[in-house]
Amino acid sequence: GFDKEIIIKTIKTSGDLFQNKKISEIGGKDLFCKEIEEKLIKKEIDIAVHSLKDMDSEETKGLTIHAYLERNDARETFVSKSFNKISDIKEGKIGSSSKRRELQIKLLNKDIKVESIRGNVDTRIEKIEKGEYDGVILALAGLKTLNLKNHIKQIFSLKEFIPTAGQGIIAVQCRENDEDTKKILKKINHINTEICALAERSFLKTLGGDCDTAVGCSAVLKGNNIDLEAQLFSDDGKEVY
């Protein structure tokens, strides 16, 4: 059993607050994590819960991810009011919050104009409903969690639209020297998710990319093997590997 009281502390990060600028302009995805990690280091909190996709591939000194919760769906979706498929758009405007998604959209449909879109999932869907954009690419995991699946028009396979590393995974972090908390977190760790997460993060770490690097990566366990799909774009977006 578990006999400790858990107090949940909600922390608004700079990534949540500055939603009128591109992620890369305000310090990258890591901005969603750094301020929470600082509170963990200062012992203001004992456990930090992150979306793994927002975390740096390098572990923060003194901290450790000690639990990966079972992965939600890692796939990407197309949300639109007027179109059923992204290929149906002849001339239109799609909202994207990342360079990776922007370049992947162009591979699927070169006629589409891609413009930056920020805000939480509700805000982005509202912009679609108002006609500000013809569609937007959103993570299926977020839409499922928020019960917004009814807005989905198309779900892409992991091969046709490779997601960002760690998509759909919740990572639970604690201090490296906090043995009591580590024992607790070990009990909720999902080993298959951990294996895939480590494979994806190792790939990112090897590349040495940052928030401006357009790269997708998805690992799936198949028996004793890991099937890792990856996609990397050159800085100018003209080459894809």
Question: Which ranges hold each PLM region?
Answer:
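Small-molecule-sensing regulatory modules
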Residues: 1-25, 102, 107-241
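Short, structured active-site "lid" loops
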Residues: 20-47
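Short beta-strand and adjacent tight-turn residues that come in two discontinuous sequence segments
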Residues: 32, 50, 137-139
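Short, Asp-centered acidic motifs that coordinate Mg2+ and/or phosphate
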Residues: 45-49, 134-135
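A conserved helix-loop-strand patch within extracytoplasmic ligand-binding domains
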Residues: 52-53, 61-112
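Short glycine-rich anion-binding loops that position phosphate/pyrophosphate groups of nucleotides
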Residues: 52-55, 141-143
